[in-house]
């Protein structure tokens, strides 16, 4: 990978050196979605640990969009596609992002469509805290549609995840008003 120059590209995005773009730490312990003073990324305020994104092996940092939080109240980091793509209703796709991620221990990353794309596809992805592979966006198209390179189509929400369990007799489970009702029993 070659060194990129600093400055602004033709799309209004700030270019970073390859080493800056390859590993960006999104510090999430200060509570607002603004650039940090050292331009390392965006602050989220969701958790006290950092969510770290890196350009995955074999991808050029210039081609990969590092995830961002769009506004101070955004719940997730926006994920982009690497190339123009056509989708056919009823088909399933696995889209590379060119990214790897380190989710803090005790948390899980959940990939979902951005609300603007919910009319086009359904998808859910789980990123475990110990996964260090290439992140993909799974798309099950519910309509014919197309996307452009670097278009933000999905989001990564990082949330706490309980992984400890205890097996107890059924009779000792706390009773609730809902009880055993499921599948629409709480109303439509």
From Swiss-Prot:
Coiled coil: none annotated. Its EC number is 3.6.1.23. The keyword GTP-binding does not apply. Signal peptide: none annotated. GO terms for molecular function: dUTP diphosphatase activity; magnesium ion binding. Its cofactor is Mg(2+). It is an enzyme of class 3 (hydrolase). CDD domains: trimeric_dUTPase. Keywords: Hydrolase, Magnesium, Metal-binding, Nucleotide metabolism. GO terms for biological process: dUMP biosynthetic process; dUTP catabolic process. It catalyses: dUTP + H2O = dUMP + diphosphate + H(+). Residues 1-34 are annotated as: Disordered. It holds the Pfam family dUTPase. It comes from the Viruses. This enzyme is involved in nucleotide metabolism: it produces dUMP, the immediate precursor of thymidine nucleotides and it decreases the intracellular concentration of dUTP so that uracil cannot be incorporated into DNA. Belongs to the dUTPase family. This is Deoxyuridine 5'-triphosphate nucleotidohydrolase. It comes from Ictalurid herpesvirus 1 (strain Auburn).
């Amino acid at each position: 990978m070659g060194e990129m120059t600093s400055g602004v590209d033709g799309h209004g995005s700030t270019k970073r050196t390859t080493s800056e773009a390859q590993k960006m730490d999104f510090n999430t312990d200060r509570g607002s979605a603004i650039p940090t003073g050292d331009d390392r990324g965006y602050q989220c305020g969701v958790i006290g640990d950092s969510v770290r994104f890196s350009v995955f092996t074999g991808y050029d940092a210039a081609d990969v969009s590092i995830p961002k939080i769009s506004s101070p109240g955004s719940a997730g980091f926006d994920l982009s596609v690497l190339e123009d793509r056509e989708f056919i209703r009823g088909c399933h796709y696995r889209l590379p992002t060119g990214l790897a991620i380190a989710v803090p221990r005790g948390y899980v990353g959940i990939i979902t469509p951005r609300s603007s794309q919910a009319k086009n596809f359904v998808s859910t992805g789980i990123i475990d805290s110990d996964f260090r592979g290439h992140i993909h966006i799974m798309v099950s198209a519910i309509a014919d549609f197309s996307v452009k390179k670097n278009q933000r189509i999905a989001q990564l929400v990082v949330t706490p995840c309980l992984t400890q369990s205890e097996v107890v007799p059924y009779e000792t489970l706390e009773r609730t008003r809902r009880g055993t009702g499921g599948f629409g029993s709480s109303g439509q």
